[in-house]
Amino acid sequence: IAECLVGSEMCIRDRIGTEHEKFGFKKKDLRPISVDDIQKIFSELCSKYKWEKIIESSKIIGLKKDATSITLEPGGQIELSGAPVKNLFETCKEVNLHQDELNAVCRNYEIEFMGIGVLPKWKLSDLKLMPKKRYEIMSKYMPLVGEMGLDMMKRTTTIQANFDFASESDMKKKFRVAQSIQPVIIALY
């Protein structure tokens, strides 16, 4: 753990990255944000912070800047896919910068974000499927393979950590450490 905190030789070679999803909601009625809201947010992020648009079927479905991207998830969740970085401090800085940019843009629209794993109050019908061909295909497939697939797509978020590894044994070691510290991380947050 200490090696990744301070950027030891191993972590200078190997990189870590995070994927951070969040739900947007309107402050006035605590309802989910719409596709139109997301289009405004993404457009303003481009103009104010120099993100580049990713377009599909004339809709902005994501943004990119250097090795970082912001994507639109099936139920309107917004995800930061971070760049590969040297240590946890850099990924923390990256997530904080993203949240600061998002908050600055969304303040004008009275939109805020929450980091919650699952939405207990909003129903599937409250969350419109986002305009990505992939999600259209997934939304037809998920009900065929289980009862909660659509809920997973539209009503959940996660934070994922991605670790480079040099070999299978290196991957096993990192996986064991990550699993061992997971209860501590959960307790902290």
What is the meaning of each model-derived region?
Residues 18-23, 72-88, 153-164:
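Glycine-rich, often proline-containing surface loops adjacent to acidic residues and nearby aromatics
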Residues 1-7, 12:
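Single conserved hydrophobic/aromatic residue that forms the stacking wall/gate
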Residues 13-41:
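Hydrophobic alpha-helical membrane-insertion signals
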Residues 118-189:
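Loop-rich catalytic cores of soluble enzymes, especially ATP-dependent carboxylate-amine ligases
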Residues 30-120:
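Active-site acidic/histidine clusters and adjacent loop/turn architecture
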Residues 15-18, 56, 63-65, 73, ...:
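A generic structural signal for short, non-catalytic loop/turn and secondary-structure boundary residues
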Residues 9, 66-70, 147-151:
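Short beta-strand/turn micro-motifs at beta-sheet edges
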Residues 9, 48-52, 109, 145, ...:
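Short secondary-structure junctions and interdomain/linker hinges
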